[in-house]
């Protein structure tokens, strides 16, 4: 049975003056052993004080984003063996305040998400039946609606780290999901928000967000589409 060394970021603000790293030896007990399996093994068998988020175990809830060997990923979608190393460094998502160990404060992240009004806005009178959307228009939403708000994209972005008011790639992807929706009539409300100095123009097209997304979505493309809409629209 293969053993892998895990070096994990630890910090309890109630008792620690500074963060530190703690090392654990983890057994890979079956093929396809996940990062989440390894963290569970540590917590359940070695150190019950280790704190991290988890929920669905199926890449749906988005709660278990981590930084592993310098790359943001979901613990429930990452096989330990795929990392190709026997020494794994696990840290909280960068650019976010650490609450304890691997748990970060996501309040600001979701506040920025809400800022772009991530819901359908209708100005026309409600019709007597559902609002029709053609298959072609529905197809335009592929690659947009699948976001699970895990934070891997925004926390990989240098602009997000440097500018605490920058909305970030997650918010922009969500904004474009509705701007691209043929049923939505809220562009006049969203575009001024996105055109702000902390909006889409602060993106430097580094593409970290694209590399980090566990759902293989493209926030940078969404940002470019929003920029084009801004240039084509008088606001």
Give, region by region, the residue ranges found by the protein language model:
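Short, contiguous acidic and Ser/Thr-rich linear segments
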Residues: 22-33
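Eukaryote-biased recognition of intrinsically disordered, low-complexity regulatory segments
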Residues: 2-24
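A generic structural motif
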Residues: 79-80
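Short, structured protein-protein interaction patches enriched in aromatics and acidic/basic residues
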Residues: 56-65
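Ferredoxin-type iron-sulfur electron-transfer modules in oxidoreductases and energy-metabolism complexes
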Residues: 32-48, 91-235
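Short strand-turn-strand beta-turns centered on an Asx-Gly dipeptide
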Residues: 27, 67-70
């Amino acid at each position: 049975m293969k053993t892998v060394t895990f070096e994990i970021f630890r910090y309890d603000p109630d008792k620690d003056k500074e963060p530190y790293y703690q090392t654990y030896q983890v057994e890979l007990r079956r093929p396809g052993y996940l990062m989440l399996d390894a963290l569970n093994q540590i917590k359940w068998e070695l150190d019950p004080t280790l704190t991290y988020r988890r929920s669905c175990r199926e890449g749906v809830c988005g709660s278990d984003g981590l930084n592993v060997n310098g790359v943001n990923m979901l613990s429930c979608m990452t096989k330990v063996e795929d990392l190709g190393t026997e020494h794994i460094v696990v840290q909280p998502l960068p650019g976010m305040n650490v609450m304890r160990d691997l748990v970060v404060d996501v309040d600001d992240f979701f506040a920025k998400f809400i800022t772009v009004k991530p819901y359908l806005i209708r100005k026309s009178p409600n019709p007597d039946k559902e609002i029709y959307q053609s298959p072609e228009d529905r197809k335009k939403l592929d690659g947009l609606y699948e976001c699970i708000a895990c934070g891997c994209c925004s926390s990989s972005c240098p602009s997000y780290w440097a500018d605490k008011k920058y909305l970030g790639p997650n918010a922009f992807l969500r904004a474009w999901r509705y701007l691209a929706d043929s049923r939505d009539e809220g562009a006049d409300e969203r575009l001024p928000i996105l055109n702000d100095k902390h909006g889409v123009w602060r993106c430097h097209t580094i593409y970290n967000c694209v590399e980090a997304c566990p759902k293989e979505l493209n926030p940078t493309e969404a940002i470019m589409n929003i920029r084009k809409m801004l240039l084509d629209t008088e606001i």
